[in-house]
Amino acid sequence: MSCCGGSCGCGSGCKCGSGCGGCGMYPDMEKSTTFTIIEGVAPINNYGNVEEKAAGEGCKCGSNCTCDPCNC
Protein backbone atom coordinates (compact mmCIF):
# COMPACT_ATOMS: atom_id res chain seq x y z
CA MET A 1 0.00 0.00 0.00
CA SER A 2 1.22 3.42 -0.82
CA CYS A 3 0.96 6.50 1.34
CA CYS A 4 1.34 10.21 0.89
CA GLY A 5 3.86 11.34 3.46
CA GLY A 6 2.53 8.62 5.75
CA SER A 7 -0.71 10.50 6.38
CA CYS A 8 -3.19 9.62 3.67
CA GLY A 9 -4.31 6.76 1.47
CA CYS A 10 -6.54 6.69 -1.58
CA GLY A 11 -10.19 6.46 -0.61
CA SER A 12 -13.35 5.84 -2.60
CA GLY A 13 -13.63 7.49 -5.99
CA CYS A 14 -9.83 7.79 -6.12
CA LYS A 15 -9.91 10.73 -3.72
CA CYS A 16 -7.43 10.89 -0.88
CA GLY A 17 -8.76 9.59 2.40
CA SER A 18 -7.42 9.86 5.91
CA GLY A 19 -5.12 7.27 7.38
CA CYS A 20 -2.64 5.10 5.58
CA GLY A 21 -5.20 2.64 4.25
CA GLY A 22 -4.35 2.06 0.60
CA CYS A 23 -7.01 2.21 -2.07
CA GLY A 24 -10.11 1.83 0.06
CA MET A 25 -11.99 -0.17 -2.59
CA TYR A 26 -12.45 -2.99 -0.09
CA PRO A 27 -12.70 -1.27 3.33
CA ASP A 28 -13.38 -4.56 5.08
CA MET A 29 -10.12 -5.96 3.71
CA GLU A 30 -7.88 -3.09 4.84
CA LYS A 31 -7.46 -4.41 8.35
CA SER A 32 -5.58 -7.58 9.17
CA THR A 33 -7.73 -10.66 9.41
CA THR A 34 -6.87 -13.72 11.42
CA PHE A 35 -8.10 -17.15 10.49
CA THR A 36 -7.62 -20.71 11.61
CA ILE A 37 -6.67 -23.57 9.32
CA ILE A 38 -7.78 -27.03 10.36
CA GLU A 39 -5.76 -29.51 8.32
CA GLY A 40 -7.05 -32.94 7.42
CA VAL A 41 -10.73 -32.01 7.39
CA ALA A 42 -10.96 -30.15 4.08
CA PRO A 43 -8.59 -28.85 1.41
CA ILE A 44 -6.48 -25.95 2.64
CA ASN A 45 -7.51 -22.64 1.12
CA ASN A 46 -5.34 -19.66 1.93
CA TYR A 47 -7.38 -16.48 1.61
CA GLY A 48 -4.80 -14.32 3.39
CA ASN A 49 -3.50 -12.78 0.17
CA VAL A 50 -6.82 -11.12 -0.73
CA GLU A 51 -5.76 -7.93 1.01
CA GLU A 52 -2.54 -7.71 -1.01
CA LYS A 53 -4.40 -8.21 -4.29
CA ALA A 54 -7.03 -5.59 -3.45
CA ALA A 55 -4.42 -2.98 -2.56
CA GLY A 56 -2.17 -3.81 -5.51
CA GLU A 57 -4.86 -3.28 -8.14
CA GLY A 58 -6.16 0.00 -6.79
CA CYS A 59 -4.88 3.53 -6.44
CA LYS A 60 -1.56 4.76 -5.16
CA CYS A 61 -1.01 8.13 -3.54
CA GLY A 62 1.25 10.36 -5.59
CA SER A 63 2.68 13.78 -4.86
CA ASN A 64 0.56 16.38 -3.04
CA CYS A 65 -1.84 13.70 -1.82
CA THR A 66 -3.25 12.96 -5.28
CA CYS A 67 -3.90 9.48 -6.59
CA ASP A 68 -1.56 8.15 -9.25
CA PRO A 69 -2.52 6.11 -11.15
CA CYS A 70 -6.28 6.12 -10.70
CA ASN A 71 -7.37 2.54 -11.41
CA CYS A 72 -10.23 2.16 -8.92
Swiss-Prot record:
Keyword Metal-binding in annotation: yes
Classification via InterPro entries: Metalthion_15p
Tissue expression per record: Leaves and roots.
Keywords: Metal-binding, Metal-thiolate cluster
MF (Gene Ontology): metal ion binding
Pfam families referenced in this protein's UniProt entry, alphabetically: Metallothio_2
Residues of the signal peptide: none
Disulfide bonds: none
Functional description taken from the UniProt entry: Metallothioneins have a high content of cysteine residues that bind various heavy metals.
Similarity comment: family membership: Belongs to the metallothionein superfamily. Type 15 family.
The name this protein goes by in its record: Metallothionein-like protein type 2 A
Biological source species: Solanum lycopersicum
